[in-house]
Regions:
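Catalytic-core helical/loop segments in enzymes performing group transfer/polymerization on anionic/lipid-linked
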Residues: 1-456
Length: 456
């Protein structure tokens, strides 16, 4: 069967014609459209990205289920309140022998909130990495996740009957614009999503009521929209933490701000991130900087000698990048080039064989978090990877390769670096004084405590 796909631009244009009516459809005052929007878009928008299927250990799931149960039970029984509750991103990184979440953990350290916080952590692929930074403040949400899965089949049947009119109207409206995609086939999926969110809402409500927070921090809004819904009803402030560089329209963020289900504030990494791309009113954006950047600088990781260079590669340019780096390695044997591949990038056997013939060029691990890796080098080179802008924010020398099939691209907000237009320019880059005057340093700025405190 032919599956109809739309470009994101087409999708957004079609949504806009029926958006007012979509937002009027509610269940318990929650806009159904916003509960299903992200999943619906991912079904119909043409997107080449792929995800891997994780291997989940049953023993890990069972152990974390009981740890979560007793942790949540303790919250309910003790009734201790915290002003700040964090729902972090599920992806953790190993830094200085501890796993941390880059967007919330350093923010906790630099924000001066002291011990007045608790972290409610969802599992990633059924596991929780240890040793965990701020581990004594972490409570697992596995119990809520698993109970939701167990109850979901029954809850879905109840939702599909009780809210049949609302779900039918949603499908009818969407099908009027996306008729080729036959939206009615997603009716069961929509009822499942609504049932899942309602279960998560009511289970999490018990915990949050006992915690009685003043503020809830989360990343990101689609994962935790049921938390935002609870907070809105209780008058609790919600703050979403930026979790990546976003430029232009995206499946996740594009749309109209809805105060019923969107966060009250959005913390951005730096001044250059201010814009409409997060679908937040500009006055609700707060440039608090990137506390993780301060954290990495302060812990002082070991550095390579000055003649070591880190090269940033990407799947789109693997072969061209390696061939270009080999040219540099042959021309300048006094420098050692370390190649860091993208996590989804796999070099061919031919490329690996070429690299193995040279002593001054090698592949280094890409499992090390990027800011940690960057902090160990003085010089970073690449083409257009966003990692180069992380390097600029750390005040590194950044060379951008602009020859041999590689082409530097810049925008008004994203720019900078020394352009390496030919092989000989590499020597100039390495030996001459570097000016960072034109570098995009404000994508990731230093943490700004005064901006954080401005909403407290």
């Amino acid at each position: 069967m032919h599956i109809v796909k739309y470009s994101l631009e087409e999708c957004l244009a079609k949504e806009a014609t029926i958006l007012d009516r979509l937002e009027e459809i509610t269940i318990n005052s929650l806009p159904i459209w916003r509960l299903v929007r992200n999943t619906f878009r991912r079904k119909i928008v043409d997107d080449n990205s792929r995800s891997t299927v994780p291997i989940i250990k049953v023993t890990d799931v069972l152990r974390n289920f009981f740890l979560s149960f007793f942790g949540l039970l303790k919250i309910v029984l003790l009734g201790k309140s915290y002003s700040n509750v964090f729902f972090p991103h599920s992806r953790l990184f190993l830094v200085s022998n501890q796993y941390l979440e880059r967007f919330s953990d350093p923010l906790i350290d630099y924000s001066e909130i002291g011990e007045d916080y608790i972290i409610l952590e969802r599992p990633q692929n059924g596991t929780h990495n240890k040793p965990r930074y701020h581990g004594n403040k972490v409570i697992y949400l596995d119990f809520i996740e698993i109970i939701t899965r167990i109850c979901l089949p029954v809850a879905q049947q109840i939702v599909s009957r009780k809210y049949k009119n609302q779900i039918d109207l949603l499908c009818k409206l969407l099908n009027s614009q996306f008729e080729e995609a036959n939206v009615w086939k997603y009716k069961v999926l929509f009822s499942k999503i609504v049932a899942e969110r309602l279960l998560q809402y009511h289970l999490t409500k018990i915990v949050l009521t006992r915690l009685n927070p003043k503020r809830i921090f989360l990343a990101h809004r689609e994962t935790f929209n049921y938390v935002i819904a609870y907070a809105k009803k209780k008058g609790v402030m919600t703050i979403e933490l930026q979790h990546g560089i976003t430029v232009g329209e995206t499946v996740l963020y594009s749309g109209r701000y809805d105060a019923r289900i969107d966060p009250d504030y959005f913390f951005i990494f730096g001044e250059s991130n201010i814009g409409p791309q997060f679908s937040m009113p500009i006055e609700r954006l707060r440039n608090v900087g990137y506390a993780y950047k301060n954290y990495i600088t302060d812990i002082g990781l070991n550095r390579y000698p000055e003649h070591y260079v880190l090269a940033i590669s990407e799947p789109r340019i693997s072969d061209v990048m390696v061939n270009t780096l080999l040219l540099l390695a042959v021309s300048y044997p006094q420098y050692v080039i370390h190649i860091r591949c993208h996590p989804q990038e796999k070099l061919s056997e031919e490329m690996l064989d070429k690299i193995s013939k040279y002593k001054n060029i090698e592949i280094v691990s890409n499992t090390y978090e990027s800011f940690c890796a960057l902090s160990q080098y003085s010089c970073i080179i690449g083409e257009n990877s966003s990692v180069l802008y992380e390097a600029m924010s750390l005040h590194k020398k950044v060379g951008r390769i602009n020859f041999n099939g590689l082409e530097v691209k810049e925008t008004a907000l994203i720019h900078g670096g020394f352009k390496i237009n030919k092989v000989e320019d590499f020597e100039t880059f390495m030996t001459k004084p570097y000016s960072d005057e034109n570098d995009s340093k404000e994508l990731y700025s230093d943490f700004k405590i005064e901006n954080f405190k401005s909403i407290l």
